[in-house]
């Protein structure tokens, strides 16, 4: 593992109790950052904290509640100091269904978590980063946001919007020492697969030229550099993690 110095940094990782979020948290912790995990699942948070070590902070928070996000940030900074790194990993896939049959309630839920939640967290952490003239933000989108997956319109739309949000915010903050980027992973071996049909999972796998799914540690390796001081120029950009599937 390449060593990236994140000493003195305080990172918030949403969706940090499992999957890519947990892998990112472990990598940032190993690189010297203090880490606070945000997740809705209190039980999984405790397991993740035990895996990372006693110094890891946790906050049970619903990122679809803008006020709850602000309060969680206050508690996080009171316990661990100013947040200089934010990785938005919380998200859901939603059901597989054609658009004309897609449940409106599910549509709203997917958009609320994947897009609105990412907006609320970014909106909360940005003022402090601007005041300190430093910050690193990575929003986790998806290859589906670039190419669209059939029978996954809500997920594809939400992740495309995260890419747009990232590009807009990165340009807004370009005059500060704040980098805002996103990554677009192909399918990874995480619990999000439990929300999908076997047929849809195979549809995604065969479209990856590497011939396999993304490993969560591979995503964490890229993100660790993006949130480091070494990433001093690149912002408002999208980094591909699709194993060759992306066409642009």
Language-model features, listed with the residues they occupy:
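Alpha-helical segment proximal to the catalytic Tyr-Lys
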Residues: 127, 171-175, 232
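Residue(s) in the substrate-gating loop at a strand-loop-helix junction
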Residues: 142
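The beta1-alpha1 cofactor-binding region of Rossmann-like NAD(H)/NADP(H)-dependent oxidoreductases
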Residues: 42-43, 60-72, 104, 217
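Catalytic Tyr-X3-Lys loop
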Residues: 84, 100-119, 134, 138, ...
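Active-site helix of classical SDR
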Residues: 122, 158, 166
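Short C-terminal tail/terminal secondary-structure segment
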Residues: 1-5, 93-96, 147, 224, ...
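C-terminal substrate-recognition "lid" of short-chain dehydrogenase/reductases
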Residues: 119, 134, 178, 212-241, ...
């Amino acid at each position: 593992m390449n060593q990236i110095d994140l000493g003195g940094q305080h990172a918030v990782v949403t969706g940090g109790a499992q999957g890519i979020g947990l892998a990112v948290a472990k990598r940032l912790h190993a690189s010297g950052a203090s880490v606070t995990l945000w997740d809705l699942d209190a039980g999984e948070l405790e397991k993740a904290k035990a895996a990372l070590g006693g110094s890891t902070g946790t906050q049970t928070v619903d990122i679809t509640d803008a006020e709850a996000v602000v309060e969680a940030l206050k508690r996080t900074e009171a316990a661990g100091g100013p947040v200089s790194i934010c990785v938005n990993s919380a998200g859901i896939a939603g059901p597989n269904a054609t658009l004309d049959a897609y449940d409106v309630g599910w549509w709203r839920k997917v958009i609320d978590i994947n897009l609105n939640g990412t907006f609320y967290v970014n909106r909360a952490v940005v003022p402090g980063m601007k005041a300190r003239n430093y910050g690193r933000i990575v929003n986790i989108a998806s290859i589906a946001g670039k190419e669209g997956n059939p029978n996954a319109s809500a997920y594809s739309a939400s992740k495309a919007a995260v890419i747009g949000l990232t590009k807009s915010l990165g340009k807004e903050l370009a005059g500060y020492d704040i980098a805002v980027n996103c990554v677009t992973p192909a399918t990874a071996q995480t619990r999000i697969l439990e929300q999908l049909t076997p047929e849809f999972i195979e549809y995604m796998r065969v479209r990856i030229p590497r011939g396999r799914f993304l490993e969560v540690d591979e995503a964490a390796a890229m993100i660790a550099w993006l949130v480091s001081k070494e990433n001093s120029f690149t912002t408002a950009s999208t980094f591909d993690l699709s194993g060759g599937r992306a066409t642009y």
